């Protein structure tokens, strides 16, 4: 019974967060919405990335509990030029061995967790995501030097309620 209660609570929290984000997104329009409107809907960004030429990208991270991260680009004129959910299989395919971990962070946002493994000398950077239609997965970037990608992998999110996690 306790597991069902935790599963129901986790599902309700996830649906509420997704619903809120969808409502916020529907209220914004590329080319028209201002940075003030974006911040009014989404709040203070987790990080602001300089794009050069006066443009910048606002990171709205939904990790560790959620499965989405949003990058919202504000052009030099102060209007929203792009709103992207970046935790997708297409974006993961662009993460390649040798890539700088800073670039990975820039593309995907802050990971859900970072776990060092002393015996193997590896560090795993994990992002939760939904693989269509609604399968909870984990994208992992593995580094052996702390600076670059050694390899990547996709697997089930073992922390998800359906796998006995929280």
Describe the residue ranges of each PLM region.
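Residues within mature, well-folded domains
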Residues: 20-166
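Sec-dependent bacterial lipoprotein signal peptides
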Residues: 1-18
């Amino acid at each position: 019974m306790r597991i069902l209660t935790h599963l129901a609570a986790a599902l309700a929290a996830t649906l509420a967060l997704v619903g809120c984000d969808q409502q916020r997104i529907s209220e914004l329009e590329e080319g028209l919405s201002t940075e003030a409107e974006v911040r009014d809907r989404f709040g203070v960004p987790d990080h602001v990335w300089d794009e050069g030429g006066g443009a910048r990208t606002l990171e709205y991270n939904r990790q560790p509990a959620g499965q989405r991260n949003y990058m919202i680009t504000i052009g030099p004129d102060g209007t929203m030029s792009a709103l992207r959910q970046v935790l997708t299989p297409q974006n993961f395919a662009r993460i390649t061995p040798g890539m700088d971990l800073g670039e990975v962070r820039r593309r995907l946002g802050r990971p859900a967790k970072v776990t060092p493994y002393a015996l193997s000398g590896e560090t795993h950077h994990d992002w939760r995501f939904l693989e269509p239609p609604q399968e909870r997965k984990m994208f992992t970037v593995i580094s052996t030097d702390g600076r670059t990608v050694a390899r990547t992998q996709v697997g089930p999110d073992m922390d998800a309620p359906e796998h006995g996690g929280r």
